[in-house]
């Protein structure tokens, strides 16, 4: 059975093999949008767990896990967007957005895996 990463790679390959540039762009954009929706769900779960941890650890002086994760997420989104739009997408061309959306989808999927790592293993 293929792994999660292999299935993702297969999705991207399917998009890149679409017959027209327009179809490739639509396909990679959909991959990105689906990854963002999944990341939002995972982020909500992580924030709920962080809030529970904050409640258990109140008064410990450790600071808020929820606030740290929220700040980390904002910084990560800035990094992802800059990396994909300004680095991968540099140079233009008709296929630029196919590569940008592919990059955005890939980095978002990577972030989902990171967010799914339990707190005590980070």
Please tell me what each predicted stretch does.
Residues 4-122:
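N-terminal alpha-helical modules
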């Amino acid at each position: 059975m293929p792994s999660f990463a292999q299935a993702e790679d297969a999705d991207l390959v399917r998009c890149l093999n679409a017959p027209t540039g327009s179809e490739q762009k639509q396909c990679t954009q959909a991959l990105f949008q689906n990854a963002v929706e999944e990341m939002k769900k995972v982020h909500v779960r992580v924030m709920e767990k962080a809030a529970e941890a904050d409640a258990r650890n109140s008064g410990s002086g450790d600071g808020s896990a929820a606030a740290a994760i929220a700040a980390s997420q904002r910084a990560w989104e800035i990094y992802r967007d800059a990396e994909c739009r300004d680095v991968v997408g540099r140079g233009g061309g008709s296929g630029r957005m196919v590569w940008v959306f592919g990059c955005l989808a890939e980095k978002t999927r990577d972030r989902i895996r990171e967010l799914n790592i339990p707190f005590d293993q980070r």
